[in-house]
Amino acid sequence: MNNIPIKMSLDFFVFCFGQSEKLSSQLRGALAADSPAMAARSSLDPTGSVLSLDESSGISDHEGFSSAEQDNFSNRKPEDQAKNSSDSEEDVEAKNPLPDVPPGCGPPTIPLNVLLDFSIQHVYHEITVLAELMQRKTNDQGEQERKMSLVHFAHATRSQFLKLVALVKWIRVSKRMDVCYSIDYLLDLQSQYFIDTADRLVAMTRGDLELARLPEYHIAPAIDVLVLGTYNRMPSKIKEAFIPPAKITPREQKQVCARLNQLIETRLSRLSSGIPPNYKEIHVANGIATLLVPGEFEIKITLLGETEMTKWSLLNIKILVEDYELGMGLPLVHNLQLNQIHGVLQSRMDVAVNPVKEAFFNLHSFCVSLQLDVLYCQTSRMAAGRLRENIVIEKYDPKERMLVVGYWVKRSKNKRLTVGQVKIDAQYRVQIYEDKDDKLGGLKVRHFPHAPRLGTIDCASGMLSMDRMLSETFAVRCSERLMRLRRILEAAEPLLEVRMTGSNVPTLSLSLLPDTSSNEEMLTVSVNSFCGKVICNINVLNSENDDLVAFAKALYSSRCSGQTIRDYLQKLRTSLVIERYRRSVAALPVREIKETELLPFVKVMLREAPKQRIILQYTRSENYYLIVGFIPEGEDVVTTKLQLLECDDERAQFIPLDNDTEVFQTAVADAVEQGTMRFKNCDDRISLLEECSREQRLAFAIITVEDRITYMYLATELQKKGVGVELRRDDAHVPGGLALHITNVKTVVPFDAAEFFKCCVRSCLRLDNRTRHTFQFEMCFENIPLVRDVPHGLAHRREGDKDTTWVQEISQVNQMTPEKLVEGIIHRLMRYLYMYKVVHQFSLAYEQYFKQWCNVEVYTFHKLVVSYGENRDMLMVLAFNVKSQNPGSQEDYFLMNFGQTMPHSQFNTPEVDWLKKPRYNPHAMMSQLLRDELKKNNDLIYIMHYLCETIRPFMVIGKFGRIRFQSQKSLSQLIGPEVFFPYRLKYHLAVLDLTTLRLMRGNVILEIKMLEGQKVAVRDVSRYRARCAGLYQLFSNIDPVTTEIMCEELEIPESDNKINAGPTMWKPEQFMDAVDVPHEDDPRMKITSLPILMTHDTIIKACDFQEIDGHVTCPLDEYLYSISYLQRALLTLERMSPRAQQGPANNLFSGYVTVVDAKPDYVRFKATQLNGDGTNATAMVYYKIYLCPEAMTLKIHIEYDEGTNSEATPKNLTALSTYFEKVVFRCGDEYALQSYVVMTRVTSFGATASIANLMNAQMDISLESKCCLQLSLTYNNTTSKKLAPATKVDQQLNNMIINVIISQSRKADSFSVLRFIYRIKEWVICYSCLKKSEVNFVTVPSELNKQLIDDVNTEVKTTGKCAIWALVSLVSDRFRSGEWNPSNQDEPIISTVAPPAPQQYVNPPSVAPGSIAPPGSGAPQQQQHQQQPPPSVMQPGSMMGPQSVNAHQYGMHRQMGGPPSMQMNPSSVGPPPGSVGMPGSVGPGSMMNPGSHQQHMMNPGSVGPGSVGGPGSVNPGSVGYPPWGPGGQQYHHHMQYPPQ
């Protein structure tokens, strides 16, 4: 059985000990080398082994040296053998087979040279030290010491070097020791191999060989299986473990349970007479009887047989006693204890006559003991915790089952007790015990002394709580003590009202004072339920008040007489009155000072004051103290005494408060009497009950004294300034009674103010301290020069009185010193005087002249408010600036502000619309000039005359000054580098003087001069030269009768800036052809700089903004916008000139035009027709954009060469012109003009009629229309933020791309884009299916779109009509039918490209419109290396780029036209208005060249980095235009200007 493991172990042993045998052989060889046998050996072992040992050793060497090793031993060099010829042992070393000792494994060594060097250095050091020491020893004794030192040094040195000599000699024979080192290393290595082998054997035995044993075969079961064919010898344990015994059926279970229930009920009925009544429940079910005693225990018993001798079996015991305060409801009896009780009780039941009764008495006794122990534990916890000072356990006897607890403990010390001991005496006790006579009863409670409704213990529930019982007991004891105290208090003072208050915590409430109404002044007496002590409290008093604490101790003690109670109540009443006085002055400018805070010399003066007193210090006059003393006299009489203490430096004195001295003679005397109340009167005795209501009188006295002190300081400061004052008594109803009257101000007024003081009846200063400490400056006037008046018919606005009194507050008195207060009074008076001087002169002319032009809203001597204007809705507010009186001040004398108010005509009307039309007072622009004028002349008559005369024209002219931005994005991209903020202010309105204004738009400057006689002069003062063609005709159209030209023309100075401020511009000969036939100029459009004289009505009509054709404008605004648009149109056409093109051309562009002639009132240009001839076309189209003299707005005239365009009918030409006026001109975008020119050049196959139909469809859209068609003129690339024309042609002029926006209405946010390419030469619309891998971002048309294109091409080839209108009509019809719905999708409805050419080519990637370089700039570098398509085929995708369609890209021209300006909130867009360049200054980076042709079209000084381009341009990328509304064009969502 063990053969296999043994064999495996031997094999492993042989394997592991292979290396060990080799090392053993080497060791034996080394030992044999020293023996004579080794020296005599002449030949090797036949097996090749170096060593040959006898077989008796039991070990044979199976490994021999190789042939190379044998040669090594036989062929030793003579040199190696001759090195140590003197010693024969070196031959043995040469043949030593022992292994070399690795470094670090042998004994430690040190080189000989290091040892010698160390010895030499040591000797040298000793010699050096010895030489230094010998120099110090000079006497005889030193000589002896030197000799001894030399001897010692020589002996030590000789001994050291003798050791070195011995060591050197030993080195010759030291090599014999190397064999010992090798032997030691070899033995250590072999020992390690043995250890590793043993460890491996143990690991194999415990792991791999654990199961390598033969099993014990069962012969007998094998025979049974082979002979009988069955296995009958399985252990029964297996069957019992896996096969459960058979169960009885449910019916049998019910029968058995019913029988057991019958037997149990029968046996219990026999014992019923002896069952204790404590068993409240006996329940028999399922063969088990459950007996329950509430709060104690529950047992379950049964019978295990039917015979009479069957004993009761106790199944379970459950203890119902619980403790939720300490044990948290956990079981109080351990399971082992229950098991022991179960065993004892079962044995007693077996021998008992009545087992049920026996079980009850045993368990009942145990549960009662357990309940008492629980109560004791709870009491111990409370006695050691929160009630440790209030309860004490006097007795606990578990045998007698008694617990006595004392509560409300009194601790006292007695001389008989040991030092540190305290006598503990409980006032009340509670005893918990078990009655010996009542065996069936539980724990009982007895209180000492007895009282009704005391706490008990509920033992039946099982939830015992000593805390609850004590809490109920404390509540009853507190009520008992309070009732006893109530009887004591009522007996001591029968008239005292004592009420029992409180529901949860009962208290006694006593009203000490007769007028006490709040609970804060009630004396409350309560009992501490924990310790039983009496607590007295008054909320207004400190809880640590000595009288309250002493009164509470007196009530708690057993010796408290009635007289003692009355004394304490009297003290408490006095303290309460004092607290009333203290609180009454809390809000006054005084603070209570403790006596410990006073200086020593002040404390000396307080010896004369009463002991019960309050010391108050005035916060504003800190050297004055008011001492309020209380002197009790008798039982119900008290005297209040006031004393004023003045402290100056280190001296203090009392100031008497009597009634003998007059007020104006003594500053602070008679302060109390002035309040009509005497605080000290020896004849009158004031009782305490009367004194309790006099705290308000004390407050009045304090304030009165302080007022006198303040008046004293103020009068002194006024007299220092030279102002005459007089302190007088006024009427008694005036608070304070005194007023400081001002009598003389001649020394502070720089001019004669006699007229002012004739009107001034009274000027005084009163002190108002009712709510806060303020001074009221009162001025009483008669015969006021100006009073309030309003137009007739306004009943609720009555006229002002000629006699009135103004009372104005001098604020911030609390933070001001008397000097600042006096300065404020003088400033207030100076304001009155200066205002009166100006107003008095104006009042003389007001009644005679100005009353019909303006009205006085209010005049209060410090401010004048006048309403003027036609509706009296403009306000002028005038006030005097007191800061101008400061020495060296540059402030204006007068503060003049302008505002608006509701028109007087709307005061009584039910509908008020003044909020719908915000008003702006234009005189606010020149408020500074008006202030300077008033300061210079002090003439308010001239100011009011100017305001009334100029308000009407300024109202309309001032509307140009409102902030309105215009976009310059398209222009900045077109003519130069794009700026960061492509917006500029539309207008600049500058004020030169009171009569001269300048209105600037771009490089156009108009000067408006206000003249007398309601006349206005307007002239063109633009820099370098006049630019307003037809300016006189504009005003003459409004009023030809009164408009005239005044004087000679004024020269405009040349530019002072000769340096180029921008890129070089082209000269006229570079982009204009020579005019063969000069154009005849209209004399009405004459350019002049002469002033044009007109009336106010004319300028008002010219500047009155009204809503016309859906946009808000006025004639002058329309005129200036047209002049500016012509200049920008010329810049746009310059970029379309062939000569302007530089560098390689783009695949798509807007075509070339040639400017023929350009004047300030018109621009003429021409271009070739797009009739299918491509670049070889010769037919021309002639354009003229001009300023119409009748309408003073831009119009266009288009003319085709005769016979070249059959569709150029008057109807179609009218449609093209109207579209320009309503859409292209109104939107103000340069790229829109380029798209318009391209579309009007297409003439092939009746394209002019199709274009005219599209334009008419856009302009004639009604609100009921279900399909809205709009041409897209400008394309905005949201990725590159660039703009481009939406309509372009290729370089060969054979293909044109058109975009049409289709939506349900102009207001619809959802829309679709119909994008197609029109083949000019073939008049068809076609497509090409391109994969996305071939052309990026190009969408393959759907089958429905392909079918639609085929249908259109078939129709146009049959009828010969133009395919543009045919396609649009078909799409719009299907759109109305609901086949297509607007969707804002990223792909267009129709995505078409040019048809493929006969030769195949690869389409290059698409280029976004923003990436197309404008004319005159080089194409992108990356496009130059791309493969170009054939010249006859348009490059697919080069225009459209990513097929991204959104409201920002196509939202610009979804409407008929755009406003001439972009209404935008300046706070949300761009820099403030001040950052926009003003005329006359050329900012860095200006885009205009002063010396070029551009300077005549645009003011170089008005174009800065942030204000590039002309007016009217709209950026559809950054500000989306809303769609059309019912009334035409809708405006931006910001505030409209002018207001509707």
Curated annotation (Swiss-Prot):
Residues 1404-1427, 1475-1492, 1513-1522 have a biased composition (Low complexity). The keyword Transcription applies. Residues 41-104, 1382-1540 are annotated as: Disordered. Keywords: Activator, Nucleus, Transcription, Transcription regulation. Pfam families: Med14, Rgr-1_C, RM2_Med14, RM3_Med14. PANTHER family: MEDIATOR COMPLEX SUBUNIT, MEDIATOR OF RNA POLYMERASE II TRANSCRIPTION SUBUNIT 14. Belongs to the Mediator complex subunit 14 family. This is Mediator of RNA polymerase II transcription subunit 14. It comes from Caenorhabditis briggsae. The gene is rgr-1.
